[in-house]
Every structure is written in C-alpha cells, then in structure tokens.
Regions:
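C-terminal output helix
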Residues: 122-133
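Alpha4 helix (beta4-alpha4-beta5 surface) of REC/receiver domains from two-component response regulators
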Residues: 80, 102-118, 129
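Acidic catalytic/metal-coordinating carboxylates
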Residues: 51-54, 65, 77-83
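Hydrophobic/aromatic residues positioned on beta-strands within the core alpha/beta folds
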Residues: 97-99
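His-Asp phosphorelay/catalytic-motif detector in bacterial-type signaling
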Residues: 63-65, 90-95
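Two-component/phosphorelay signaling modules centered on CheY-like receiver
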Residues: 30-47
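The feature encodes the CheY-like receiver
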Residues: 74-75, 92
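Active-site residues of response regulator receiver
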Residues: 70
Length: 139
C-alpha cells in the first residue's frame, strides 16, 4: 500500500518503522521509480518525488540517508537540487546518486557533490550495489 503525501510524493506504508534507511527516489518517470524501488534488495523505507521541487521539499522533510536523483526533471533540474542539498547543513550526510542519460554530465554532477553517477540504462542489480555502497561509506 502506498500513502500519498501530495501529488507525486508517497511513502511505502509497510516500511515506516524506525531503524530503516530512507531512500528518496526522485525521477519524473513513474516506471523508472518503480523499477528502482522493486530492484532494491534490503530493508529500506522509500519515498518518491516526481519533480525537482518535490524532491527538495521531501529531502528537507525526511532527511533521507540516500537520494537517487535524476538529472532531468521538471521544476528544477537534478543539478539544481543537488546544489541545494549540498548547501543545506541538515542534509550534509545524505548520499546522492545521480542518474543521467547523458554520459557527458557525469563530471559536472561529481563536481556539484554527487557521491555516485549512474548512466541510464542500468541493470537492476547495479542500483542495489550503488545504494549499499554509498550507505557503507557513510557508516
């Protein structure tokens, strides 16, 4: 069951117990958000946003351990959201994995403070390895 917080933002009701790492999935494509969510193996709490403004608002509200952030979204690009996240002291420990379809944007995302950049398309097991890797680095 999914609980809507507002348009395009939801939390998985079965995973709201404390102690789980929160993964915020930010992408304007619902099918990709679902693919990421079902691909992640492990006990995670999920939240989703479908544009840059919602991504930033939900990050500030939930303070996720990991953000999976698409580069190209409406209402704010992934780079704009990433810049805001990196300037927000309350979110300084959030690991950010940037998704892009344009390999040439990798360097810019890393300069802006991304922990990892993944080029689309990717295999489902790659997203699990990426999330586990950035979480291990933060611990």
């Amino acid at each position: 069951m999914w609980l809507g917080l507002s348009a395009g933002i939801c939390l998985h009701a079965g995973q709201m117990a404390g102690g789980l790492a929160t993964v915020l999935i930010c992408d304007d494509e619902p099918s990709l958000r679902e693919l990421i969510r079902v691909s992640l193996i492990g006990p995670y709490r999920f939240a989703e946003a479908d544009d840059g403004e919602q991504s930033l608002a939900l990050a500030r509200q939930l303070r996720p351990e990991v953000m999976i952030l698409d580069m190209m979204m409406p209402r704010r690009s992934g780079l704009e959201v990433l810049a805001e996240i990196r300037q927000d002291e309350a979110l300084s420990n959030t690991a950010v994995i940037v998704l892009t379809a344009q390999p040439g944007t990798r360097e810019e995302a890393l300069r802006q403070g991304a922990d990892l950049v993944m080029v689309k398309p990717f295999e489902p097991e790659q997203i699990t390895a990426a999330v586990e890797g950035v979480l291990a680095e933060r611990r």
